[in-house]
Amino acid sequence: MARITLDHLAHAYRPDPHTADDYALKEINHVWSQGGAYALLGPSGCGKTTLLNIISGLVRPTRGRVLFDDLDVTDLATEARNIAQVFQFPVVYDTMSVRENLAFPLKNRHVPRDRTAQRVEEIARLLDLTRVLDRKASNLTADMKQKISLGRGLVRPDVAAILFDEPLTVIDPHLKWQLRSTLKEIHRALDITMIYVTHDQTEALTFADKVVVMHDGAVVQTGTPDELFERPAHTFVGHFIGSPGMNILPCRVEGATAFIGDQTVALQRTYRPPYGERMELGIRPEFVRLQPRGTGLPVRIRRIDDIGRARIARVEMSGRALAASVPDGISFDGDEAALALDPRQIHIYANGHLVSGESIDGGRA
């Protein structure tokens, strides 16, 4: 088991980096506590896999250190780090049985046969592989093969952490939830540090206790799923997390009022942004309500989508597109309507970053 510390870590694939843009992974300082379930979330190319490969030892960082507990492992080889890594595509030996695949890491370390057999049985029960232990891996489905890959990482009792790099990519959609649930059960049973890399917000938010969101090589926010949804620290987080994502509207802010085109929005906090900064108002569609015309901010309806659990209106206000929730039992004649914004759920951003204003009674928020 291990606490993983990233100390002033950065990486560039070019040999002579000079500017921040030269770095695929911009400087990161972060600690993953022992036994936690974490996710690295972000779009393709944001640096997730680079970071994972640095932790596992497949890539040496350009600068900074990786520590397991208080031990500097930056220059240690992968096999010396006691790390297990599960990749996008299952890594199994098709000519071997499931039992032989699970036993292989222990056999390579000359673990006695009786201990190996016992450990293989334990992991097989945990992963529901007991009934196929003596079948050839070549005859199994992709999700079963991925379970074998996971089992080969878990079978070593000395593993400090398990790293998952998009492990459900090849799994059928209807089986993904089941395998995610299995991972959560394993985490609870073994109390092992797990770091899960994905571009899929559903996978990250349902697996992890804390999520690290990455964008353009940098960490933009770390928090619980609730924190990321309720208080995004960056406009990217607001837009990337949620379906649909947060409405992000260019605005001008004066005190406790935001100006969006020719419309004004009252705020619950007072802001004093520096001159020249790009200001934006963010609010999630769940907190924007479509109403009959004349009862709020005037908008034009472009379409209304029924997404099963709710109806989402796509509207235009002062030339800006945004999404709003449609209350049950309300219908609209024509394309003219109004919006009501919940002032408690409005966030103000300067150059993409959340701004803390002062509440009307003078406190910071």
Which positions does each model-derived feature cover?
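Non-catalytic connector elements of ABC transporters
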Residues: 244-246, 256-365
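Conserved coupling/switch loops of ABC nucleotide-binding domains, chiefly the family-specific signature
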Residues: 62-65, 216
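Short beta-strand immediately N-terminal to the Walker A/P-loop
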Residues: 38-39, 85
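Helix-to-loop junction immediately C-terminal to a conserved catalytic motif
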Residues: 56
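A short, flexible loop at the N-terminus of ABC-type nucleotide-binding domains that lies
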Residues: 1-6, 12-27, 32, 75-80, ...
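ABC ATPase nucleotide-binding domains
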Residues: 82, 92-236
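Conserved ABC transporter NBD signature motif
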Residues: 64-72
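The feature captures the beta-strand-to-loop junction immediately N-terminal to the Walker
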Residues: 41-43
